[in-house]
Design a protein with these regions (language model features):
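Catalytic core of pol beta-like nucleotidyltransferases
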Residues: 1-24, 30-36, 49-96
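Conserved G/P- and acidic residue-centered "switch" motifs that form tight phosphate/ATP-binding loops
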Residues: 27, 41
Length: 96
């Protein structure tokens, strides 16, 4: 299963006024093997010289989970562990 066009538009619209420079999908939804229990894995990078607090990140998560009716994992690209980064680099699909 992949994200629907509607889900992609919800994500794009949500981040349209946020300080996010790039946004990627990876994991089971990027590979197309997601099921009804899969979460949505998103990785973002911020505009230069921009930071986001943990509270800000938590708000993004709560908002997205409500809008998508699905658990979301949201991680800043520069904080990915090297082992995860190599998987991410192979699987990533650009959203923004």
């Amino acid at each position: 299963m992949y994200l629907t066009n509607q889900q992609i538009e919800i994500i794009k619209n949500y981040f349209s006024d946020k300080p996010v420079n790039k946004l990627y999908l990876f994991g089971s939804y990027a590979r197309g093997d997601a099921d009804e229990n899969s979460d949505i894995d998103l990785v973002f990078s911020l505009h230069k010289d921009t930071r986001i607090s943990y509270f800000g990140l938590a708000k993004y998560l709560v908002d997205l989970e409500k809008k998508l009716n699905r658990k979301v994992d949201l991680v800043e690209e520069e904080l990915l562990y090297p082992r995860i980064k190599s998987i991410f680099d192979r699987e990533k699909k650009t959203i923004l």
